[in-house]
A protein has these predicted regions:
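Carbohydrate transferase catalytic cores enriched for Leloir-type hexosyltransferases
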Residues: 1-372
Length: 372
């Protein structure tokens, strides 16, 4: 079996879907020596994605999310021979004589189109219906995403397999001495509230700021809030809200961290807060749990499925409830101990090896028969 895997996005985005692609490639290279792989890579990126003789890297000129992608990508692929193409970023090429597996991470753009840029709305909204129609099979990050595909796009349930993701194994408990250099570098004191992720409207950071202001007013000793991640899109309102709420001295923005520094931040935090309006998976929840950090997160999308009984769940529209949950998770020591213990048990359900094995099983089922 010869499998092509579209890894072009890794050059443009190292977080989120880019991390999914990298971990999947690394585990497949370790687990599957019986099949051949073609990694479709951006010609701009010289970084090897897999150190394995059965993995061939083919540089492509066509960039991700380009308006001419459906014209130029099939032309570039026509010179290659493979049985199956895995498109891990929602949209496959329409043309080509090969089986198509797509991964759908979430359907945020259908639930909350106002949370995307006009360009992103055009790319995903205009193509997702055709993508799920031409795909021979679909991998979904969670049961919540599978249910959305069935309900919103009319996909037959048997056409979708749920393959859960996992945190990077580097996320683990660290002692204070190991965290100290990272905290010193960013001038942080341990015990802060932490948000991690892209700064974008879907993450409900403005709601978090409003709830945090209310908590600080009620309890002036509330620790600082650290926003760790990168600026995504439509993020100006976040900075306007910080200024309007007079939180400049309490909120810190820490950008573009390597994963190793995120490990230290999770360990040094008193609490992770992820009040997203929608998540297709929610890796920060598992990353925090793997480090022993209590979690408060939204009850929307996949988060109840991923967090299990190991987090305090909140309605992201109820900012008073969010403030109360943060206060409780900071002050209730028996609850904090329970969340830590349950978090370690919960995160043990997930591994990239399991993700890769289940994905490989889909590859083999798809190529074994022309009938799904």
């Amino acid at each position: 079996m010869k499998i092509a895997l579209d890894a072009r996005l890794v050059y443009y985005q190292r977080g989120g879907i880019g991390q999914y692609i990298l971990h999947l490639i690394q585990e497949l290279a370790r687990l599957d020596t019986a099949d051949e792989y073609i990694l479709l890579h951006s010609r701009k990126d010289r970084t090897p994605l897999a150190q394995a003789t059965h993995f061939q890297t083919v540089p492509l000129w066509t960039p991700c999310h380009n308006r001419f992608e459906q014209i130029t990508l099939p032309v570039e692929l026509a010179r290659l021979r493979f049985d199956l193409l895995h498109s891990p970023d929602f949209v496959p090429p329409w043309r080509g004589r090969f089986r198509r597996l797509i991964t759908v991470h979430d359907l945020t753009f259908l639930y909350y189109p106002q949370f995307l840029t006009a360009e992103s709305r055009r790319y995903y909204n205009d193509q997702i219906e055709r993508a799920v129609r031409v795909a021979d099979h679909i991998s979904a990050d969670s049961t919540a995403t599978k249910d959305d595909l069935v309900r919103l796009l009319g996909v037959q349930p048997e056409k979708v397999s749920v393959v859960l993701l996992a945190p990077d194994p580097i996320y683990r408990p660290l002692d204070a001495a190991a965290c100290a250099p990272v905290l010193a570098r960013h001038k942080l004191e341990p015990g802060f509230l932490l948000f991690t992720g892209t700064l974008e409207p879907r993450k409900n950071v403005t709601g978090l700021l409003t709830a945090y202001r209310a908590l600080c007013d009620r309890k002036p000793s509330t620790p600082s809030l650290v926003l760790a991640g990168r600026r995504g899109w439509l993020y100006d309102e976040i900075f306007s809200r910080i200024a309007a709420l007079k939180l400049q001295d309490r909120v810190r923005l820490v950008e573009n961290l390597p994963n190793e520094e995120f490990v230290a931040l999770y360990n040094a935090a008193a609490l992770l807060v992820l009040p997203s309006f929608y998540e297709g998976f929610g890796l920060p929840v598992l990353e925090a749990m793997a480090c022993g950090t209590p979690v408060v997160c939204s009850e929307r999308g996949s988060l109840p499925e991923i967090a299990g009984d190991a987090a305090l769940l909140i309605n992201p529209d109820d900012l008073d409830g969010l403030a109360a949950a943060m206060e409780r998770a900071l002050d209730d020591e028996p609850l904090r101990a329970q969340l830590r213990s349950r978090g370690f048990a919960n995160v043990a359900r997930f591994s990239w090896e399991k993700t890769a094995r289940e994905t490989l099983d889909i590859y083999r089922r798809m190529t074994a028969s022309r009938v799904e």
